[in-house]
Amino acid sequence: MSRNNEELQGISLLGNQKTQYPTGYAPEILEAFDNKHPDNDYFVKFVCPEFTSLCPMTGQPDFATIYIRYIPHIKMVESKSLKLYLFSFRNHGDFHEDCVNIIMKDLIALMDPKYIEVFGEFTPRGGIAIHPFANYGKAGTEFETLARKRLFEHDAQ
């Protein structure tokens, strides 16, 4: 069952050959589309191996693989807009932990998922690797319980 034009309203970046790459943090670039299967609970996983941001103290680049897993509700994130959004961190100065939490909060604001987790596997600097993990489960649902459980067990992956 293909999507019709009405279902694709608001998706402007996918297939656009005149892509504009943001030069600064750009949450407004994120686009969403309707989940055709809101009655099914299923995971969507993105692996983003080319994430870069800047150290807020030194201005040096930080590199990471960002893992995003979510259980959609009504809306889902469009992947090209996600790619451009993550690219917008390239000149953004923030700590690793901040980047992961900002990404999660922006995706919650966009999609209102049942559950989401964002994990950053940052390349070691100064001999230390930082791997922040943030998650969220919709309040008052079984996903709130899942989020709490995953928070304490995420390193057992």
Curated annotation (Swiss-Prot):
UniProt-annotated binding residues for substrate: 77-79, 96-97
Compartments it resides in: Cytoplasm
Major localization class: cytoplasm
Enzyme Commission number, as recorded: 1.7.1.13
SUPFAM superfamilies: Tetrahydrobiopterin biosynthesis enzymes-like (SSF55620)
Record Gene3D superfamilies: 3.30.1130.10
Keyword Cytoplasm attributed: yes
Active site: 55, 62
Regions that span the bilayer: none
Coiled-coil zones: none
Family: Belongs to the GTP cyclohydrolase I family. QueF type 1 subfamily.
Reported function: Catalyzes the NADPH-dependent reduction of 7-cyano-7-deazaguanine (preQ0) to 7-aminomethyl-7-deazaguanine (preQ1).
PANTHER family: NADPH-DEPENDENT 7-CYANO-7-DEAZAGUANINE REDUCTASE
Name of the protein: NADPH-dependent 7-cyano-7-deazaguanine reductase
Organism name: Neisseria meningitidis serogroup B (strain ATCC BAA-335 / MC58)
